[in-house]
Amino acid sequence: MDETKRSKQEALDKRYIRMASIWAENSYCQRRQVGALIVKDKMIISDGYNGTPSGFENVCEDENNLTKPYVLHAEANAITKIARSNNSSNSATMYVTASPCIECAKLIIQAGIKRVVYSEKYRLEDGIELLKRAGIEVIYMSIES
C-alpha cells in the first residue's frame, strides 16, 4: 500500500473507531460499554454494543455488580445482525472499542472478517493472539490519536 492510500486508510480507521466509541454509549451496561462496527467497501454493514439478548430486561449486572452470563459482547451482536441480513462480512473490517475476547475472536474468524481495529487493550491477549494466528490484520488505535 502506498503512502497516500495508507494515510487515507488511517484517517478512515480513526473515524470509524470514534464512531464505534459513540455507538458504545447505547449500551445499558454500567461496568463497561463496548461498541462495534463492521465496515465493508467504506459502508457500515452492521453495528453492535454489549447488552442483553432481545426481549430481556436491559440490566447487564447482577446485585453484586458482576456481568450476567447471558450478556452479549458488542462483536457478537454485530456479527449476529449480519447473519440476519443480506450482507456478508467476508473480507470486512471490524472496529471495536475493546480488544476482542477469545470467544469473540472465534466468531470474527468464522465471519470472514479480515481486519480488526480496536482502541482499548484488555488484560487478556488471547483473543488478539488467535486473530493474528488466523491471519487477520489486527491494529491497535487509540481514540485520542
Per-range role (PLM):
Residues M1-S145:
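Zinc-dependent deaminase catalytic domain
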